[in-house]
């Protein structure tokens, strides 16, 4: 006879108001920006093997921090900093209800103040940063803060990362492709080195639309990669499936 309890343990129950992953749930109904492919890409891709202390700048719902917690060893500690109060509270709640409650800590604070006052440095910093210029006012103030660069320009983001990163640390971001190239140029001007660049498109023949970057203060060759999220017929590519298989249900 099938044990229903064992079935429930193996397959997470779907819940509303958020996104159910294999090992955790991310509530995002109080966050301006919801769980999306950008955050999932960064959380699944970022190198965690050498990380011991991690910072997620603009952590939103806490998605990326929780993905890194799942992928990393138990001694790795992860901090998230988030300006918007509702999002920070929800990220704290998501972390508290996850299997890694003791390892993930959320700070509701402006990252500029955080960078000035925080005593710790991080060997891995990640960010899914804002990317719209505030030329047109957004109808939702929280969403405006989450996705417009008015509160965190790329120049300011790099400056904050410089203050918070260890000498050998890496800084990883995901952005729309054109803005990622702009950030790359700005980073080089500020004496960062591009150590890895992943150009992303939806499927073969489509234009590049996202970019993953690894920046470092240490010189080294740049590794260039390309990722198609889907195959020509529209199904997820084997490469993308390999990234998400530990997280997405049914993969």
From Swiss-Prot:
Its EC number is 2.1.1.223. It comes from the Bacteria. GO terms for cellular component: cytoplasm. Keywords: Cytoplasm, Methyltransferase, S-adenosyl-L-methionine, Transferase, tRNA processing. Transmembrane segments: none annotated. It is found in: Cytoplasm. PANTHER family: TRNA1(VAL) (ADENINE(37)-N6)-METHYLTRANSFERASE. Specifically methylates the adenine in position 37 of tRNA(1)(Val) (anticodon cmo5UAC). Belongs to the methyltransferase superfamily. tRNA (adenine-N(6)-)-methyltransferase family. This is tRNA1(Val) (adenine(37)-N6)-methyltransferase. It comes from Yersinia enterocolitica serotype O:8 / biotype 1B (strain NCTC 13174 / 8081). The lineage of its organism: Bacteria, Pseudomonadati, Pseudomonadota, Gammaproteobacteria, Enterobacterales.
């Amino acid at each position: 006879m099938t044990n229903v309890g064992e079935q429930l343990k193996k397959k997470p129950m779907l819940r509303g108001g958020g996104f159910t992953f294999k090992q955790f749930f991310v509530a995002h109904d109080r966050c301006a920006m919801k769980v999306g492919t950008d955050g999932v890409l960064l959380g699944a891709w970022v190198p965690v093997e050498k990380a011991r202390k991690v910072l997620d700048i603009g952590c939103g719902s806490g998605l990326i921090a929780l993905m890194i917690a799942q992928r990393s060893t138990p001694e790795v500690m992860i901090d998230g900093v988030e300006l918007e109060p509702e999002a920070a509270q929800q990220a704290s709640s998501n972390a508290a209800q996850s299997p890694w409650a003791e390892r993930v800590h959320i700070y509701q604070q402006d990252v500029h103040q955080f960078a000035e006052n925080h005593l710790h440095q991080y060997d891995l910093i990640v960010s899914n940063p804002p990317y719209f210029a505030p030329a047109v006012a957004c109808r939702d103030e929280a969403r405006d803060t989450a996705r417009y660069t008015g509160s965190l320009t790329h120049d300011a983001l790099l400056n904050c990362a410089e203050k918070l990163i260890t000498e050998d640390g890496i800084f990883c971001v995901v952005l729309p492709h054109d803005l990622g190239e702009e950030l790359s140029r700005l980073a080089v001007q500020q004496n960062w080195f591009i150590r890895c660049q992943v150009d992303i498109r939806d499927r073969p023949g489509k234009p590049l639309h996202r970019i993953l970057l690894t920046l470092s203060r240490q010189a080294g060759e740049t590794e260039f990669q390309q990722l198609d999220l889907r195959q020509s017929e529209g199904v997820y590519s084997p490469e993308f499936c390999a990234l998400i298989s530990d997280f997405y249900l049914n993969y």
